[in-house]
Structure formats: structure tokens, C-alpha cells
Amino acid sequence: MSFVITNPEALTVAATEVRRIRDRAIQSDAQVAPMTTAVRPPAADLVSEKAATFLVEYARKYRQTIAAAAVVLEEFAHALTTGADKYATAEADNIKTFS
């Protein structure tokens, strides 16, 4: 038989920390977005234009990656919170059963 030992409060703290990390990533992305998505060619030649286009596209993909990571982090935080609630409920039910 398998046993699981967990601390619901620790799971709740972890969920809060994951959300803080997500919020910080979103905030950092928002701060740099104007600079990274508005790269202008340093000269009026084809190479400069291609380089600027490449950098803007790279920044766009970065922003998409951050947005996807934020979704994953929120889902993970939600799973931690849900797990903490379920473990806390199970513990409360066990206490009632044996009281």
C-alpha cells in the first residue's frame, strides 16, 4: 500500500510563489516589449533591414513563449491550490472519522 504525506499549507505557499513568478515574467515582458518589437534598421540597406526584421520576429516569438509559459504556470498554480484544498479536506474528514 502506498502512502502520501503532504502539507497543504506548503502547497498553498508554493502556488502563491508560482503565481508571483508568473506575474513577474509578464511584467518584465511588458516592460521590454516596446523596445524589442520596434527595432529599426540602423541603415537603409538590405542587410540592416533583414537584421531588424529578424530581431523583431525573434522578439515576437519570445513574447509568445512568455505568454505560453504564463498559462502553464497558472495551470500549475491552480493544480497546487486544488491539491492543497483536497488534502486539507481529506485531513479534516480523517480527523472527524477518528474523533
Curated annotation (Swiss-Prot):
Pfam families linked: PE
GO terms of molecular function: protein heterodimerization activity
GO biological process: protein heterotrimerization
GO cellular component labels: extracellular region
Subcellular location: Secreted
Coiled-coil positions: none
PE domain boundaries: 1-92
InterPro entries from the UniProt entry: PE-PGRS_N
Keyword Ribosomal protein: no
Keyword vocabulary terms for this entry: Acetylation, Secreted, Virulence
Entry-linked Gene3D superfamilies: HP0062-like domain
Cystine bridges: none
Modified positions (N-acetylserine) in chain numbering: S2
Stated role: The PE25/PPE41 dimer induces both a strong humoral and cellular immune response. PE25 protein alone induces low response. The dimer induces necrosis, but not apoptosis, in mouse macrophage cells. It also induces activation and maturation of mouse dendritic cells and drives Th2-biased immune responses.
Assembly and interaction partners: Forms a heterodimer with PPE41. The dimer forms a 1:1:1 heterotrimeric complex with EspG5. Interacts with PPE51.
Similarity comment: Belongs to the mycobacterial PE family.
Designated name of the protein: PE-PGRS family protein PE25
Organism: Mycobacterium tuberculosis (strain ATCC 25618 / H37Rv)
Source taxonomy: Bacteria, Bacillati, Actinomycetota, Actinomycetes, Mycobacteriales
